[in-house]
A protein has these predicted regions:
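A conserved acidic beta->alpha catalytic loop
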Residues: 24, 36-48, 59
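Catalytic-site signature of metal-activated, phosphate-bearing donor transferases
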Residues: 64-71, 88-223
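Single-residue signature of alpha-solenoid repeat helices
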Residues: 190, 224, 262, 296, ...
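N-proximal low-complexity "stem/linker" segments adjacent to membrane-targeting elements
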Residues: 1-24
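Short beta-strand/loop segment that forms part of the nucleotide-sugar
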Residues: 9, 25, 30-38, 55, ...
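Residue at a conserved register position within TPR or TPR-like alpha-solenoid repeats
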Residues: 215, 253, 287, 332, ...
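Short aromatic/hydrophobic "clamp" motif used to bind/position activated sugar donors
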Residues: 79
């Protein structure tokens, strides 16, 4: 490329992801330095095929030492640091913008913040964003610090306090996807490294916070609070992970059954972090817990009005936008303000058609109020994903609204094939007994279904509770209002406040099954984001 960038990496057994990473930067960097800490797969061969200089070293449990070994081998004036499970995002203007940025850099500019977007869940249906210094000058005075959760920004700021600027570049991180975490056993590895570091270096605040975050990740909130509380009293907002510390402390109190103490933490620090959308959403969740819908709506109004601060805080996707709108809809529901709840869910889906929390709440609301046009309105405005259409089927059948299925027959063709019983049940609800029997007959022949089960399903489908009017359904809905329970584990900025909405619309069995997907990025704030 000719603008002088060395890519520096440390790897171990990354044959499954290294090729993807290196392909994305082949037009960005001029040399590749790979420090291998003991791979037994094809990692080093893949690196050499891409022209990398491969340095083998023994792993001693210190990430910074391995990182600094790669920096020492770099020969170009600028250094880009990536992990094998990350991909540099290419855009049509990226190459030109990168060349312009580095060529125009003043002498007092030593590095740039890069947005790291970490995908979560099974396939990245949610994500967290973080700003990390990954592009910086090649200078022997600049070095990584920290045995675990290593960072380089402190080293740069010691030379120039304002020496790291924001850039418009992005890296996608795949390391927090469920399968990757399982395969790498990251939790056990991190706990071992943290304990070793504490034995070697003593009770450093960064290490204590890292340990607290690991306890938090394991849902051991009492253990986490024993570390979080003293740290919150000791540390100042200037430290790179203080906002995470506040959020995790509040959530830990809530999870052990002390919502009042959780709310006290949020109220104490919200004036300091008045643009931290995730914290403001947590305030709303806590107020909803107490049945104070109007106060919750005020928190959400503030979250929605806060400017985007992806460069300041680690934040979960949808904070201040569709997540806040979904929580807003839930607050309106609990206040029996149905039209406003419908409008909030619709607005959330316009912003994010894949928001299953908003969609499922809207389906339930439409069923309870007898307003199917709400579903048609959304379907006409946005392109809903297949999972959304699939969720419509059980809701329509449970609400005895087979007309919903007929209205959206074209969009439901695929989901109905995936749920073959649904068509028979819908026909039974429509009174088409012969057609329903024909649709359900193949299931009667399946031994696993039992001889009478399809007909029991058919009787359920055609039954209708006496007097099941919209008013009766709404009264029942008010007796069991949705509780926005947050996920039990954390992301980069701590647990996901508005993922409460995501969980509230799901059956308990599904929530239990889904718990392993709640992601970790627990100590990413230790990588020193920009203070402004």
């Amino acid at each position: 490329m000719g603008i002088g960038i060395s890519l520096c990496m440390i790897v171990k057994d990354e044959a499954g992801s290294l090729q993807r990473c290196l392909n994305a930067v082949r037009d960005v960097v001029d040399e590749i330095i790979v420090v291998d800490t003991g791979s037994v797969d094809d990692t080093t061969e893949i690196a050499r095929l891409h022209g990398a200089v491969v340095i083998r070293t023994e792993w001693n449990g210190n990430f910074s030492e391995a990182r600094n070994l790669s920096l020492a081998a770099a020969t170009k004036p600028w250094i880009l640091v990536l992990d094998a499970d990350e991909v540099w995002v290419q855009t049509p203007q990226m190459k030109t913008e990168l060349m312009r940025l580095l060529a125009a850099s003043r002498d007092d500019v030593w590095g740039y913040w890069i947005q790291v977007t970490s995908l979560l869940g099974v396939s990245g249906e949610e994500h967290v964003t973080d700003a990390v210094c990954r592009l910086f000058r090649n200078d022997p005075r600049i070095a990584f610090q920290g045995r675990i959760h290593e960072e380089i920004a402190s080293s740069i700021m010691a030379l120039a306090p304002q020496g790291v600027l924001h850039s418009g570049f992005e890296v996608i991180h795949y390391g927090y996807l469920e399968q990757v975490i399982t395969d790498k056993n990251k939790g056990a590895r991190n706990m071992q490294l943290i304990r070793f570091a504490l034995n070697q270096e003593g009770d450093q605040p960064e290490l204590l916070y890292a340990l607290a975050a690991e306890w938090f990740q394991q849902a051991k909130y009492d253990e986490a609070l024993r570390l979080l509380q003293p740290l919150l009293a000791q540390l100042k907002p200037e430290c790179g992970y203080h906002s995470d510390l506040v959020l995790k402390t509040a959530y830990a109190w809530r999870e052990i059954g002390s919502p009042e103490r959780a709310l006290a933490v949020v109220e104490a620090w919200a004036p300091v972090y008045e643009d931290f959308r995730d914290l403001l959403e947590l305030g709303a969740v806590l107020e909803l817990d107490q049945g104070r819908e109007d106060v919750a709506l005020n928190w959400l109004k503030q979250a929605k009005s806060a400017a985007s601060t992806a460069s300041r805080y680690t934040s979960v996707s949808g904070a201040g936008t569709y997540r806040s709108l979904t929580l807003e809809g839930m607050a309106y529901e609990r206040a029996s303000r149905w039209a406003e709840a419908e409008a909030a869910y619709t607005a959330a889906l316009v912003l994010q058609p894949g928001s299953m929390a908003a969609w499922q709440r809207l389906l339930l609301l439409a069923a309870a109020t007898g307003r199917p046009h709400a579903i048609a309105s959304v379907a006409a405005r946005v392109s809903l994903p297949p999972a959304a259409w699939q969720a419509l089927i059980p809701t329509a059948l449970a609400a005895h609204r087979p007309d919903w299925l007929l209205r959206h027959a074209a969009a439901l063709a695929g989901p109905l094939r995936a749920q073959p019983l649904a068509a028979g049940l819908a026909l039974a609800q429509l009174g088409e007994d012969a057609a329903a029997r024909a649709a359900l007959q193949p299931w009667a022949a399946q031994r696993s279904m039992g001889q009478r089960r399809p007909w029991r399903c058919g009787r359920w489908a055609t039954s209708s509770p006496a007097g099941a009017t919209p008013e009766r359904r709404l009264a029942s809905r008010q007796r069991c209002p949705p509780r926005p329970t947050p996920p039990r584990r954390c992301c980069c900025a701590g647990p996901r406040p508005a993922a409460a909405a995501w969980r509230a619309a799901r059956p308990a069995a599904q929530r239990q099954a889904a718990r392993p997907r709640l992601r970790r990025a627990a100590c990413s704030r230790l990588r020193k984001r920009s203070p402004a």
